[in-house]
Every structure is written in C-alpha cells, then in structure tokens.
C-alpha cells in the first residue's frame, strides 16, 4: 500500500485524493498520536490554510476531527505555513495542522502536521499517524471532554499581526531600515497576500504588489514562484531594485534582480550565508543544502571558506540537519530557506525580508551580491512510467551513473532521484556546458527507461 505522506505531508487532488473524510480521519489520528498521555485534559491545536477554495471544507473537517477527539482548536484562518509553525511554537500548542498544496494548482490541496515547537513531523512519526488513521478508532470523548473551537476574522487578524511583529523583530537594521529600496512582491494570490507587502512596507521599503487578491480560485494561476514572468516584467516596468515571488503558502521565495535576472534559492542562500558570516552569526561557518543544489553553490562556498552539508530533498530534512548540528542556515534551490534563529521551517516572507536587509546594509545591488555563485548548467529529465523503487539497486543503471560521473570529473555532477510525490525518476546532470549536460542526461534517461521498465 502506497504511503500517504510524501516529502511534504499528504497532497493530491482535493475531494479525490484528499477528501473531507480523510482529513477528518487524519486529524483524529494525529490527536491520538501527538497528544501526550496524562497531559492536558484539553490539548490544544492550531489549524490554518491557504486561500484555495477546497481549504474551506478540508479545514472544517480537520477542526471537526480534532474537536471530536477532545482537542481544543484555534482556527486561525488564512495565514502562511511558517506563520502557523511560528504560532504553534510560541503559543505552546500541542500541534498544528496546515491545509495547503503550496505551489500546486488550485484544484490540489494538502495536509501537513507540525509537532509541539512548530517543527514538521519526522518520517517515523508520520508513519505512526498513518497507521492510526488506517486502523481507525482514536479518542472519542463525550460531554465536557469534547474539544471547543474558536476562530473568526478577529482571530485571523490577530494571528497575522503577531506574525508580522515577529518578522519585523528579526530585521538586522530594525523597522525602517529598508528605506530607499523599491520591491515588487508577487503573492501568488496566496497566503502571503495579507502579510508580505505589509511587512516589507513597515520595514521601510517602497512596495509594488501584484497578485495579492485571492478569491479561492486564482492561487498560483500564472503567478508566484513557479511563474516568474509577471514579477520580472513588473520589476523592469517600475524600475524596482528587486522582485520577490512567493508560492501559495509562502514557505518559499524566489527573486528577480533589477535587470530581470532570476535569482534561485541557491543564490539566496549564498547571499544570506555570507551575511551571517559577516555578522559573526554563521555557526561553524556551515551551510546546509539539499542534493539538488547546484554545484556552483558548493564551489562558491568553498572559495569563501564555508562548509556545505548535504541532505535529502525537503526542507524538513534540512531542518533536521540544522537542529542536529546547531547550524545557522539551510535551504533548497526551490526557494525554501530556513533560518533557525527566527523560524522553525522554511519561511518565504522572512527570506525576502532578509534578502532586502542585506542589500540595505551593504548598499550593493542584488545582481552584485548574487555574483558570488556561478551556476553550472543544470539539466533535469523526468522519466515516467518506470519502477522507481529499483533506481538505487539496478547494477547496470548504477554502472552507467558511475561512467557519467567519471566523464564529468570535478566540473560536473549526476543525481538520480526517485520522486517522493510522483511515479517518476528524476535524472539531474550538471556540467560546464549545457550541451554536455543534456547529452549525459538523455543517455542516462534512456538507461532508466530500459532498466526500470514496468
């Protein structure tokens, strides 16, 4: 039986892959697993969502499931995923549940669970929750022991206000320190809409906002971090210093410089890593990144005397490594950046704020700051219709990968990775020249199709 939880919670087509019944059942299961025996008579949980339409009935189902299991619920409405994580941490709640499919199209939705302290659940705990869900049962109190539910517009506004105040408190130069910078921010018609433009403005920046009018149907629709065209055009049209683009739940951020060049998570991490180093805040001179980060980032960090630790794909694996090592920064090429001093998970609004802070404190352009990373051409081929479970064990395929690595030498890299959320194998190749990377990737993709055919 396929595992429900992927690399970032449960995700799929709302009302088909993720139904109200499933959301309710997972909520009951989470309550049975995450509430400590003998703890609070009424454990507490926070529930939030992004603005997509299906989030309304799915969050209602989660709230119902939790309350029926004896959990008091604070429904904080539409806020970014990192806002929920922060509020779970600072409020002392037992856990939190977020309804979002991040950058996915509007018809999809997802459910992710945050433990006490605002951290994502480890794989083994997700497995226990999934087992409890499949077995059914769980806590079913009666009378005064059932959970109570609180929510509404005032609760949502208070959650947003608290999150904005927290973000401003992290600003190295304090409120107003971004004065003189003009930023275009694309909120993807998502959860960032009510907070990202506001926090940037309160930090002193001149803000031009696009795609910040969510109606439940337009989230990620031709906008946001997966569609950089609109924010690029707006930066050039307005003569802005920088553009920021969030995804639907604002746990990631990509950028565009004043000349319209895209800035990915690797480049953002490099800028923020060196900022921490220059302030004496980069623990062990170490950056944590995933195996998908461009080799150019590793080479740049080597030149700067920074050690790079690699993890699997997913910001929770980055966070696990950060916590284990006590390090200061980590993230993904996709724009998830984790700053443990200020957040318990990837936070796109925080990332954008600190990127502008670095520009303000140095007086340098984003193009100049990101020049530290010389990205190698990277080619990614998704091979569908294969048995991804054999990708790490087929001898002929592994031999082909080894041959490719020898061919590329120190100026290239090969990564073969089964997708954690889709039935496919990703072949990623980096080389000094695009044609070389494409040729190697195509050859390996052919071997994958041949050797892993169903």
Swiss-Prot record:
Mg(2+) binds at residues 102, 247, 249, 251. Its cofactor is Mg(2+). CDD domains: GlmM. Its EC number is 5.4.2.10. Binds 1 Mg(2+) ion per subunit. The active site is at residue 102. One of its GO terms (cellular component) is cytosol. Activated by phosphorylation. GO terms for biological process: carbohydrate metabolic process; peptidoglycan biosynthetic process; UDP-N-acetylglucosamine biosynthetic process. The keyword Magnesium applies. Keywords: Isomerase, Magnesium, Metal-binding, Phosphoprotein. The modification Phosphoserine is found at residue 102. It is an enzyme of class 5 (isomerase). HAMAP family: GlmM_B. Belongs to the phosphohexose mutase family. Catalyzes the conversion of glucosamine-6-phosphate to glucosamine-1-phosphate. This is Phosphoglucosamine mutase. It comes from Kineococcus radiotolerans (strain ATCC BAA-149 / DSM 14245 / SRS30216). The lineage of its organism: Bacteria, Bacillati, Actinomycetota, Actinomycetes, Kineosporiales.
């Amino acid at each position: 039986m396929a595992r429900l939880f992927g690399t970032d919670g449960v995700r799929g087509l709302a009302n088909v892959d993720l139904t109200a019944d499933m959301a309710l059942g997972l909520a009951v299961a989470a309550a049975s697993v995450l509430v400590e025996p003998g703890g609070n008579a009424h454990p507490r949980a926070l529930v939030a969502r992004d603005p997509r339409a299906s989030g309304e009935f799915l969050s209602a189902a989660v709230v119902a499931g939790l309350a029926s299991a004896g959990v008091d619920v604070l429904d904080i409405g539409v806020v970014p995923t990192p806002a929920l994580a922060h509020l779970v941490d600072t409020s002392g709640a037992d856990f939190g549940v977020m309804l979002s499919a991040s950058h996915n199209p509007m018809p999809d939705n997802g459910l992710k669970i945050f433990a006490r302290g605002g951290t994502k659940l480890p794989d083994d705990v997700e497995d226990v929750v999934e087992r409890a869900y499949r077995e059914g049962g769980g806590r079913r109190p009666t009378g005064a022991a059932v959970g109570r539910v609180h929510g509404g517009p005032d609760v949502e506004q208070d959650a947003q206000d608290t999150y904005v105040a927290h973000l401003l408190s992290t600003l190295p130069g304090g409120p107003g320190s971004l004065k003189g910078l003009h930023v275009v921010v694309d909120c993807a018609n998502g959860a960032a809409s009510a907070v990202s433009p506001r926090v940037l403005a309160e930090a002193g920046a001149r803000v031009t906002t696009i795609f910040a009018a969510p109606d439940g149907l337009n989230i990620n629709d031709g906008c946001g971090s997966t569609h950089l065209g609109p924010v690029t055009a707006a930066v050039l049209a307005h003569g802005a210093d920088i553009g920021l683009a969030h995804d639907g739940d604002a746990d990631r951020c990509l950028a565009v410089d004043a000349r319209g060049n895209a800035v990915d998570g690797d480049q953002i991490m490099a800028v923020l890593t060196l900022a921490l180093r220059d302030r004496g805040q980069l623990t062990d001179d170490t950056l944590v990144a995933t195996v998908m980060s461009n080799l150019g980032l590793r080479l740049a960090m080597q030149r700067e005397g920074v050690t790079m630790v690699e993890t699997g794909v997913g910001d929770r694996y980055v966070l696990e490594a950060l916590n284990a090592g006590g390090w200061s920064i980590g993230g993904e090429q996709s724009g998830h950046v984790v700053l443990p001093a200020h957040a318990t998970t990837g936070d796109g609004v925080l990332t954008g704020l600190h990127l502008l802070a670095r520009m303000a404190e140095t007086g340098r352009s984003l193009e100049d700051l990101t020049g530290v990373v010389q990205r190698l051409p990277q080619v990614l081929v998704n091979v569908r219709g294969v048995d991804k479970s054999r990708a790490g064990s087929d001898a002929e395929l592994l031999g082909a990968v080894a041959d490719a690595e020898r061919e590329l030498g120190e100026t290239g890299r090969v990564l073969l990775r089964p997708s954690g959320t889709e039935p496919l194998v990703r072949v990623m190749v980096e080389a000094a020249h695009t044609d070389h990377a494409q040729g190697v990737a195509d050859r390996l993709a052919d071997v994958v199709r041949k050797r892993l055919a169903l």
